[in-house]
Amino acid sequence: MPGATAVGITYAGGVILASEKRIAYGNFLVSKNTRKTFQITPYVGAACAGLVADMQILSLQISALAKIRKMDLKRDIPPNSVAKMMSNMMYERRFFPLLTQVIVGGVVGEPAIYTLDSLGSVLPDEYAAVGTGAEMALGVLDPQFKSGMSEKDAVDLAVRGIRSAALRDSFSGDGLDILALDANGAREIAQAA
């Protein structure tokens, strides 16, 4: 599976999803500006690691399903429902899996994140990292995460985690995409490379 690093962090009132921008296959650097963080609904997003085509099709299909579900229910779809829809789609393809790991996060009520593997296992947590740089990122997140931290602290922690991974993982690097989700919706946070 191609490498990448993505992290998700809950904070007081919201969720930060972040990913780096590099795509590399073996020794070949394919792109330095690839989006691996996606807005699924106005209040839910996903950060992915793995094959970019699989990330893109999964996020587009789940976004469409979430819009249909919202019209049916006449209310916003919470992150756990988006994660479950994604899990079902990934499990249906278990014999020809989508080669991606995903962190789904958002705020409809309380902030929440869920980690999914390529077969659709759903694991809730307060913070997570996926991809080939996950071990290095978790080495930063584990000792420094504090429940109820501020948005600024969560963004800083996400940046430190991904930068730590990029130092040791040749499949990660070339800048960051950061998506903040709170009760007001999703917004991108500008970040220097």
From Swiss-Prot:
Record-linked Pfam families: Proteasome (PF00227)
EC number in record: 3.4.25.1
Location in the cell: Cytoplasm
Catalysed conversion reaction: Cleavage of peptide bonds with very broad specificity
Keywords for this protein: Autocatalytic cleavage, Cytoplasm, Hydrolase, Protease, Proteasome, Threonine protease, Zymogen
Main location: cytoplasm
Activation and inhibition: The formation of the proteasomal ATPase PAN-20S proteasome complex, via the docking of the C-termini of PAN into the intersubunit pockets in the alpha-rings, triggers opening of the gate for substrate entry. Interconversion between the open-gate and close-gate conformations leads to a dynamic regulation of the 20S proteasome proteolysis activity.
Keyword presence, Cytoplasm: yes
Active-site residues, as the UniProt record annotates them: T5
Residue positions assigned to the propeptide: 1-4
Sequence similarity: Belongs to the peptidase T1B family.
Protein task: Component of the proteasome core, a large protease complex with broad specificity involved in protein degradation.
Protein name in the entry: Proteasome subunit beta 1
